[in-house]
Amino acid sequence: MKIFFIFSYDLRKYFRKYSYICDEINTILFEKRRAMNDSNTINKGSLPGLKEKRYLQKKAIIGFLYRMGELSKPEICRLTNVTTPTVSRMIEELIEEGWVIDRGCGNSIGGKRPHVFSLNPDAAYILGVDIGREYLRVAIFNLKNEPIEGILEYPSILEEQDDEATLRYVREKIDETIGHLNIDRAKIKMAGFALPGLIDREGTSYTYLTYEQPGIKSILEEMLQIPVFIDNDSNVMAMAEHTFGVAKDVNNVLCISVNECIGLGMILNSKLYRGGIGMAGEFGHIRISGLEAPCHCGKIGCLETVSSGRAIEKVAGKPLQDIIEAARKDDISAIDLLHRAGEKLGEGIATMVHLFNPDMVVIGGEIVQAGDLMLVPVQQAINKYALARMRGHCELKMSNLGVYSAILGTLMMVMEHLYDDTECGYSLY
C-alpha cells in the first residue's frame, strides 16, 4: 500500500502548483447552484410537516455553508429566505448536532465585525475511488474538500480476477482505508467511482464489472449503503481539470488521459459532453494512418496500439515509469519510443482539433510524468497535421493535477449530482 500524504489541515502544501484547489471547488459550486430550490431536492415525505420543513431549512443552511465557507446569520437569512429567529434556532440545533461551528467575529468590510459560522469539516465525508487497470486509489474527503491524511494507493486486480473477486477486493480496500483513517463509517454520505472503459448514462459498465442487471451502480450502493455515482475515468478527469486544473474556466477543452489505455473527456461550451448513451470519447480507438497492429478491442490500427502506456511497455518490455526514467537519462531507444508515441498521439489530436475546434487540449494520466519528452512530439505533430488557424487558437498543456486528476474528479462528480436541482434524494444532511 502506498500512501500519498495530503494533510487535511493544509492541502495546499502538497498541491503547490494549484494551491487554490479547495477554495475554487467551493466558489464554483456556489456560482453554479446558488439559487437552487431545496424543496425539490429531497424526498422526506415520511416526516411530519413541521419536521420536514425544519429538515429542509437545515439542509439549505448546510448547503450554503458548504459552498461558501463562512456566513453570518444575516447572510444565511438572505440566501435561504428564512427569518432571523428561525435561522438562529436552526444554527443552534446544527451546532448541537455537530454540523456547524461558531467561528466568532469574522472580517469586517466596513462597520461592525459580523459573527460568522462554518461547517464542521468532519461532520460528513465523501468517498472517492479510482479503479485503474494498474492501481486502485481511495480517498475520503471532508467538507473542506480535502482528502483526509492522504490518497491511498493499492495494487489493482481489475484485469486479473473476475468481477466478484474484484468487488470483494475493492470493498476490502475501502474498509482498510476507513480503518486506517479511524473515521466513523456512518459519516460517509456519498461515493464517487471512476472506472476505465465503456460506461453508460445509467452507470452500467460494459468493459469492467459488467453487471447488466441491476448494474454496478446499484450493486455498489447495496454494498456501501450510500448513494454512488460512477463515470468513465476520462470524464471525471475532465471535470477536475475544468474546475480547478489548467483548464479552469476554459469553455471548450479536450482532456486526454494516457494510462494503460487512452481516453478522452470533452468539455464543450463549459459542459461535459457524454454523447447519446454516455460513451463519447473513445479516442484510443480511432484509426491512425500507417498502423496495422491488432488492438485488444479486436480492430486494427487503433491509436492505443502505439501511444498507450500498454503499447509503450510492450515494445520496451519494462514498466512505463522505467522507460521515462531511461529517457531522462538520455537513453536513445527510450526517447525514440516516447517520441513515436507522442507523434501518433498528436496526429490523432490534430483530427480532434479539426472536429471540435477546442480552446485547449490537456494531456493527463500516468504519461504526465514524461513531461516534455511526450509534450514536444505531440505539439510537433499537431503543427504538422492541423490547420494553422485552428491550431493557433488551441493551447496544448500537461495536466497540473498529475496522476490524481481522476480521483479528484470523483469528488466533483458527487458535487455535481448533489447540487443539481433536477435530481432528487441526495443530501449531506
Each predicted region: which residue ranges?
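General beta-strand structural signal in soluble alpha/beta enzymes
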Residues: 102-103, 228-232, 266
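ATP-binding/phosphotransfer module of carbohydrate and carboxylate kinases, centering on a glycine-rich
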Residues: 4-186, 291-294, 299-429
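Short, ordered coil/turn segments that flank beta-strands lining enzyme active or ligand-binding pockets
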Residues: 143-144, 201, 268-269
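Short glycine-aspartate micro-motif
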Residues: 126-130, 188-192, 253-257, 263-265
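Short helix-capping/turn signature of helix-turn-helix
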Residues: 67-68, 244, 259
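Glycine-rich phosphate-binding loop and adjoining helix at the ATP-binding site
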Residues: 150-252, 373-385
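Glycine-rich phosphate-binding loop of actin/hexokinase-like ATP-binding domains
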Residues: 249-306
